[in-house]
């Protein structure tokens, strides 16, 4: 439809001076509208603009029929007085901007969850309708982390994993997103239309070098034309037997009518490179151990907004030293311990859990830095002090190795020494003392000496010198 007039509501203009509209893949649609308002309307406009305003811009045909040009949220405005006239400018943005207001910290640690389910879960927190034009049923198979990103930024990054993109709805109230290219209508291309064709070589090389290997230069051939007709992203046309799809629109208000410039490309050329989690590289997130399995752990991230999720991903646990043959240090944390989930690079799938972090405690074990203590939750302990090593079960049994006094072994039960060959006990300068409250028995094969209220000897021969 060719417009005869343009009208706006609920904020209207006496005279429209200028309109600019831009729409593109992975971008919020925006329209800037400038015009005159009456003095009486200024106060009413300011009252309306105190809250969220959904502004609808329509083209009015010669016979009074209407067609929506743009419908979005007023995100900025200005009113100025010039030569006794009030000029107002509105910036209107598609409802997708509601997803781009706040940053979030969420983890998705269910490796059986699909990307589509992640989209659905987050959209459920808003009044957002999302239409999947491409399949997104793949399971994540790894950690998916939303780190200091808005939901809009997060959705774009997830979409890029399939070389896809988001397209916001620009002709309805509310928020609707398309994952992938919307199914548009065919454009009846007229041979009388002026057009331009150009090759986006910079875009081609950028995509090629970022993992999109099956793209060719001809896929990045752009077709551009200007008409008065109102089309939308996803509409397509055939030119020389090739289908070109609208991926970008720039509209201007020229001499009382809207002129639309459309950019089209083959669908294959619209693929976007995979976007990495750049701002999380090197970050460490405070977490609590949920479960331990062999040399891996499950964790709950303390700052996670997604608290009610099912967690079934185990992360490698960093240790002091380890080799594939099992050589090294094996000392795993316990459930409830505080640790750190570390993202070493730009892919959250590479995450691992780092060493435990000391929490506030009144335990005397952590008061003296000169004391090094290795202790389990079962109270089994090895303690290194400046002048001793103590091994104890904290239940009456211990071995002390001290610099001045030597070795002190205390047992709450029996002490058993066994050897396949000799056992030698000797003292270079002191005495050898064997003492027992009940008795003392020295035995060698069939010969024995028993000290029990008296001395008993058993054997074939006794020699006394």
Give the label of every model feature segment.
Residues 1-465:
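Amphipathic alpha-helical and helix-coil boundary elements used as assembly
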């Amino acid at each position: 439809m060719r417009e005869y007039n343009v009208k706006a509501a609920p904020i209207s203009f006496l005279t429209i001076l200028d309109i600019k509209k831009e729409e593109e893949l992975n971008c919020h649609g925006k329209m800037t509208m400038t015009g005159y308002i009456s003095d009486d309307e200024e106060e009413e406009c300011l009252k309306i603009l105190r809250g969220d305003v959904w502004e609808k811009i329509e083209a009015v045909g010669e016979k009074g029929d209407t067609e929506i040009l743009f419908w979005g949220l007023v995100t900025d405005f200005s009113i100025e007085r010039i030569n006794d006239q009030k000029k107002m400018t509105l910036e209107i943005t598609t409802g997708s901007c509601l997803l781009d207001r706040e940053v979030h910290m969420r983890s998705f640690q269910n490796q059986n969850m699909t990307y589509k389910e992640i989209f659905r879960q987050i959209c459920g927190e808003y009044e957002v309708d999302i239409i999947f034009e491409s399949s997104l049923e793949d399971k994540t198979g790894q950690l998916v982390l939303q780190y200091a990103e808005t939901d809009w930024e997060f959705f774009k990054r997830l979409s890029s994993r399939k070389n896809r993109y988001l397209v916001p709805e620009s002709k309805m109230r509310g928020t609707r997103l398309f994952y992938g290219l919307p199914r548009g209508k065919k454009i009846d291309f007229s041979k009388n239309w002026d057009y331009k064709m150009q090759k986006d070589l910079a875009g081609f090389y950028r995509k090629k070098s970022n993992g999109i290997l099956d793209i060719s230069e001809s896929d990045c051939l752009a077709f551009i034309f200007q008409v008065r007709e109102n089309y939308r992203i996803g509409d397509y046309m055939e030119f020389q037997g090739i289908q070109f799809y609208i991926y970008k629109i720039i509209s201007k208000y020229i001499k009382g009518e809207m002129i639309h410039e459309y950019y089209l490309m083959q669908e294959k050329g619209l693929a976007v490179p995979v976007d990495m989690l750049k701002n999380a590289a090197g970050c460490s997130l405070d977490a609590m151990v949920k479960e331990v399995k062999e040399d891996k752990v499950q964790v709950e991230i303390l700052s996670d907004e997604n608290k009610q999720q099912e967690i079934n991903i185990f992360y490698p646990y960093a240790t002091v030293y380890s080799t594939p043959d099992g050589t090294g240090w094996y000392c795993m944390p316990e459930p409830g311990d505080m640790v750190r989930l570390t993202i070493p690079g730009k892919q959250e799938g590479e995450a691992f859990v780092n060493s435990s972090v000391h929490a506030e405690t009144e335990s005397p074990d952590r008061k003296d830095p000169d004391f090094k203590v290795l202790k389990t939750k079962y109270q089994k302990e090895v303690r290194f002090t400046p002048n001793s090593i103590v091994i104890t079960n904290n239940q009456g049994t211990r071995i002390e190795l001290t610099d001045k006094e030597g070795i002190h072994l205390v047992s709450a039960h029996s002490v058993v020494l066994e050897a396949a060959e000799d056992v030698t006990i000797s003292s270079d300068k002191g005495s050898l003392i064997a003492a027992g409250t009940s008795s003392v028995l020295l035995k060698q094969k069939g010969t024995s000496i028993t000290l029990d209220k008296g001395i008993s000897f058993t054997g074939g021969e006794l020699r006394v010198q």
